[in-house]
Design a protein with these regions (language model features):
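Short, solvent-exposed loop/turn and secondary-structure capping segments
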Residues: 61-64, 88, 95-99, 142-145, ...
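Aromatic- and Gly/Pro-enriched helix-to-coil junctions and flexible linker segments
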Residues: 51-56, 63, 78, 82, ...
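Extracytoplasmic electron-transfer domains, predominantly the class I c-type cytochrome c fold
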Residues: 1-53, 100-160, 221-284, 435-439
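Sequence/structural segment immediately N-terminal to covalent heme-attachment motifs in c-type
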Residues: 12-18, 49, 69-88, 188-213, ...
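Structural preference for beta-rich elements and adjacent junctions enriched in aromatics
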Residues: 289-531
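Short acidic/polar inter-strand loop motif in beta-rich domains
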Residues: 56-59, 164, 287-289, 510-514
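Electrostatic cytochrome c docking/interface patches
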Residues: 58-78, 167-200, 290-299
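Extended surface/linker regions that mediate inter-domain or inter-protein docking
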Residues: 52, 145-198, 210, 282, ...
C-alpha cells in the first residue's frame, strides 16, 4: 500500500483484471502470484475494491486531525464500518466473512479474548482490548488497526465491552482486575533445560508433541475443523505465535492460558515461577533463533559416488538448507484459504549422473497409510501428572484415516530454453514436469501439466523417479532422485549444470481435505547444479 497512492487508479484496475500472468513480459509477470480477475469479478466490483484500497491506503498515510473524545456512539459507528463484516452486527462472530476465516471471528458477546493480562476465563482489561484492536492477531484474518485514530480505537473498546453483559456485571460488583505479573527472565542453564524438558514432556507434549510440532496424541480428541477447534501451535515456528515469541510472551501465555481454546493456564498454585521459566527455556530450544530466510538459488553441490538415501548422512547435514514459503492456491476453486503447510526446507546434491532433493515439511497429522511402507515415529502418550489422572484410564483413540493422502509435488519446466511457465502448474504454451509423491502408495509419479486443470500422468516407461520417505514427530522427510538426462526429452526436464533451473513445490494435507487444486503452492525458485 506504500506505493499504490502514487499510481493512477486505472493502473490498479488493469493489474486486478489481468493479474500477474496477463501482464507484458517486461513486468516479469511470472514472478507474480496475482491471479486475473476479469472472468470472476464484474467491472463494478473491481472499482468498489479499488475505492476501498485507495481509501484504506489513504488512512494509513493521513495525518491525524482533531479527534473527538472516545464514545460509545463513535465506537458503534467504527465497529459497523470496520468490524461487523467478520464479527457480525451483534458481535456474535457471524458476519458475512466469517466462513472465510480460520479460526472463526471471536464471539464478542462472551466477553473473552485469547490474549489477556488477566487469568484464564476472566474478562480482559481495557488495555488488553485496545492492544488486540491495535495489533490484530498474527496469522489470522484479524488485522491490526493501528492506522485508525487512537480515540477511534478507544471508542471501539467502549463499544466492544457493551456487547457482553460481563463487563457491566464486573463493574457493578466493584471488582478489579488481577493482572498476571511477568518478571525478568532468568538466564538459561543446562539444569533449567533438563527440568524444562521433563515438565514439557509431561505437561505439554500431549498436544504439542515431543518436538513441539503440534502432533501430540491429544489432538485426536481436541482438533476438529468442523467445530473450529484448531491445532496446537507449532512451537518450532515461533514467528507464527499470536502474542509474540519473547520469553516474557511465552511466560504470560503459560500463566494466562488461551481462553476458549484447549490451552490451559499454568496456575501458580501448581507451578512455581521457576518451573514456568524452565518450560520457557526448553521451548526456545525447539526452534531456530530466527525465522529462516528464503535461499535462492538452491545449491546442489557436486559429490562423488552414490547419493545417500539416509536422511542423517553427512552429505545432507553439510548441504545448504533453503527455506521455501508456501501459500494457499487461491486462483481456481476449490481454493485453499487456510493451508496447514506454510513452508518447507529443501537441500540438493548431484553426482553428474543423478540429482537428489531432500525435502522436509511439518504436518501435524500423519496419514496412517504410510506405516505400511515406511518408518514412522509418532509422539507417544505422555505420563499424566497426578492432578490430571482420572479414576479410569482413557482408552487410546485409533487415528482416523483421512479420505485423501498427504502429497508433495516438485515442479520443473519441461524446457529450459523457453519462457518460464506460469507457476501454477504451467500454461497452454509452456508445460511443466511434476514429480508427485503420495502417502497412498509411497511412490513418485511423473506428470505433465498445462495449468491447474490440465494434468496428465506419464506412461509407465517414463516413470523413473525414485523416492524414500519417513515421518517423525510431526514432520515428513523425503529424498527424491532422478537421472540428470532421460530419453523422453519432450516431456521431462533435462538437468544441466552451471545454469539456473526453475523449481517450485505443491503440498497437499489430506487431513485438511486438500486434493486437486486445493493445496499449498510456492512461486518459482532457482535450483543450481554446481559444475
Amino acid at each position: 500500500l506504500d506505493s499504490i497512492l502514487s499510481r493512477p487508479q486505472a493502473y490498479t484496475f488493469w493489474r486486478i483484471m489481468k493479474g500477474g500472468k496477463g501482464l507484458p513480459e517486461k513486468y516479469e509477470p511470472w514472478n507474480s502470484a496475482m491471479p486475473a480477475w476479469e472472468d470472476s469479478l464484474s467491472k463494478e466490483d473491481v472499482w468498489k475494491i479499488i475505492t476501498y484500497i485507495y481509501e484504506t491506503a489513504g488512512q494509513w498515510h493521513a495525518k491525524p486531525g482533531k479527534q473527538d473524545p472516545p464514545s460509545l456512539e463513535r465506537g458503534k459507528q467504527v465497529y459497523l464500518e470496520k468490524c461487523a463484516y467478520c464479527h457480525g452486527e451483534g458481535g456474535k462472530g457471524d458476519g458475512p466473512s466469517a466462513d472465510y476465516s480460520m479460526p472463526q471471528p471471536r464471539n464478542l458477546t462472551k466477553g473473552h479474548i485469547k490474549l489477556r493480562s488477566t487469568s484464564f476465563g476472566k474478562i480482559p482489561t481495557d488495555k488488553d482490548l485496545f492492544n488486540a484492536i491495535t495489533k490484530g492477531m498474527q496469522n489470522t484474518t484479524m488485522p491490526g488497526w493501528k492506522h485508525l485514530p487512537k480515540n477511534d480505537r478507544k471508542s471501539l473498546v467502549i463499544f466492544v465491552k457493551s456487547l457482553s453483559k460481563k463487563f457491566e456485571k464486573f463493574k457493578k460488583r466493584g471488582k478489579s482486575h488481577k493482572i498476571i505479573k511477568v518478571g525478568k527472565p532468568p538466564a538459561s542453564s543446562k539444569e533449567s533445560l533438563e527440568r524444562g524438558k521433563e515438565l514439557f514432556m509431561v505437561q505439554c507434549s500431549g498436544c504439542h508433541g515431543v518436538k513441539g510440532r503440534g502432533d501430540g496424541v491429544a489432538t485426536q480428541r481436541v482438533v476438529d475443523y468442523s467445530s473450529n477447534a484448531i491445532w496446537p501451535r507449532n512451537l518450532s515456528q515461533p514467528w507464527t505465535f499470536r502474542r509474540g515469541n519473547s520469553k516474557k510472551d511465552l511466560f504470560k501465555t503459560l500463566r494466562t492460558g488461551l481462553s476458549t481454546t484447549a490451552m490451559p493456564k499454568f496456575s501458580p498454585r501448581v507451578f512455581k515461577d521457576e518451573q514456568i521459566w524452565d518450560i520457557v527455556n526448553f521451548v526456545t530450544t525447539l526452534a531456530p533463533p530466527a525465522q529462516p530466510k528464503m535461499q535462492s538459488p538452491i545449491h546442489a553441490k557436486k559429490v562423488e559416488g552414490e547419493i545417500s538415501e539416509d536422511f542423517n548422512a553427512p552429505i545432507w547435514k553439510q548441504a545448504q538448507a533453503s527455506f521455501i514459503p508456501l501459500g494457499g492456491q487461491l486462483q481456481t476453486k476449490p481454493k485453499s484459504y487456510f493451508p496447514t503447510v506454510r513452508n518447507l526446507m529443501v537441500r540438493a546434491a548431484h553426482n553428474s549422473k543423478e540429482v537428489a532433493l531432500y525435502i522436509h515439511w511439518d504436518d501435524p497429522s500423519l496419514d496412517p497409510k504410510l506405516k505400511k511402507f515406511s518408518a514412522v515415529e509418532e509422539s507417544p502418550q505422555p505420563p499424566l501428572p497426578e492432578h490430571l489422572k482420572g479414576h479410569e484410564p482413557e482408552e487410546p483413540l485409533e487415528a482416523a484415516t483421512p479420505e485423501f493422502p498427504d502429497s508433495i509435488a516438485v515442479q520443473f519446466p519441461v524446457s529450459l530454453d523457453k519462457q518460464k511457465p506460469y507457476f501454477l502448474n504451467g500454461d497452454a504454451e509452456h508445460p511443466v514436469n511434476l514429480w508427485k509423491w503420495s502417502t497412498a502408495t509411497n511412490n513418485a509419479v511423473e506428470f505433465n501439466a498445462h495449468g491447474l486443470e490440465n494434468w496428465k500422468k506419464q506412461d509407465e516407461l517414463s516413470q523413473v523417479v525414485k523416492v524414500k520417505a519417513s515421518y517423525e514427530y510431526g514432520q515428513y522427510s523425503l529424498i527424491i532422485k532422478r537421472k540428470l538426462k532421460v530419453i523422453h526429452e519432450k516431456i521431462d526436464i533435462q538437468f544441466q549444470t552451471g545454469r539456473p533451473i526453475p523449481i517450485a513445490f505443491n503440498v497437499w494435507d489430506g487431513y485438511h481435505e486438500e486434493t486437486g487444486n486445493k493445496k499449498s503452492t510456492s512461486s518459482w525458485f532457482t535450483l543450481w547444479l554446481d559444475e
